[in-house]
Amino acid sequence: MIRKCTDHGYFRGGSCQQCKRPGRYVLDDGREEKLGRFVSGTLRHFPASAGVKMDKYGWIDLNAFCEVMKKRYNWMRKEYLYALVESDEKGRYQISGPMIRARYGHSVNVDLDYDESDTPYVYYGASPEEVDVLLENGIFPIKQRYVHLSTTYEKAAEVALIHTESPVILQVDAFRAQEDGISLKLATDYIVLAEKIPPDYLFVLED
C-alpha cells in the first residue's frame, strides 16, 4: 500500500516512518504490484513493445508513459507513477523533469550516464560453484546490460542469498580498475555498474 504524508511525501505501509502518521491513502497493494511490474518491465526490458520511445540513456517521456498506462489500466492516474517512484526504498527509478528511467537492471542496450563511483572497493556475491570460473574469466553481465556490484559487503551478501544458500563474496579493487580505464558507475548508494570486471581485480573474501 502507498500513502502520502503531507510533511514527508509518499511512503509504503500503514504509517509514515518519520512521523508515524497514517497519511492519505493513494494506492492499494494489488494496483501497486500491477503498476510496479509494468513500470519495471517497460523501463528495463521492453519499451518498444509497451509503445514508448526510449533514448540512448534510458529516458522516456513521463507523460507519454502515463498515457500508455491509462490505456492499459483505466484507473491509472499520473500521481500513481510519482507515488511508485518516490516511495520505492530501493531507488529503482529516477524522474528528472518530464522524463523517467530505471536506474539499473536493464536488459535493453542503454548508456547510463552516471558519475564514476569513488568507492575504493566494491563487492560481488557468487555461489561456491561460480567462484573459480569468475576468478579465471572475470565477471560479465548475464541477461543484463551491466554487471551489478554492491558498495558494501553486506549488500553483496544480501543479494547473493537470493540465489544461493552459501554465498562467497568477491572484493573488486575498484580504485585500481578505474586507474586502468574501467568505468564503474554509481547508480544508487548501494549499486555500482560496470561493463565487465576482468579477473585481475577480483579477490575472495574469507568469512
Swiss-Prot record:
Belongs to the KptA/TPT1 family. This is Probable RNA 2'-phosphotransferase. Pfam families: PTS_2-RNA. Its EC number is 2.7.1.-. The keyword NAD applies. Keywords: NAD, Transferase. Removes the 2'-phosphate from RNA via an intermediate in which the phosphate is ADP-ribosylated by NAD followed by a presumed transesterification to release the RNA and generate ADP-ribose 1''-2''-cyclic phosphate (APPR>P). May function as an ADP-ribosylase. It is an enzyme of class 2 (transferase). It comes from the Archaea. GO terms for biological process: tRNA splicing, via endonucleolytic cleavage and ligation. One of its GO terms (molecular function) is NAD+ poly-ADP-ribosyltransferase activity. The keyword Cell wall biogenesis/degradation does not apply. InterPro entries: Ptrans_KptA/Tpt1, RNA_2'-PTrans_C, RNA_2'-PTrans_KptA, RNA_2'-PTrans_N.
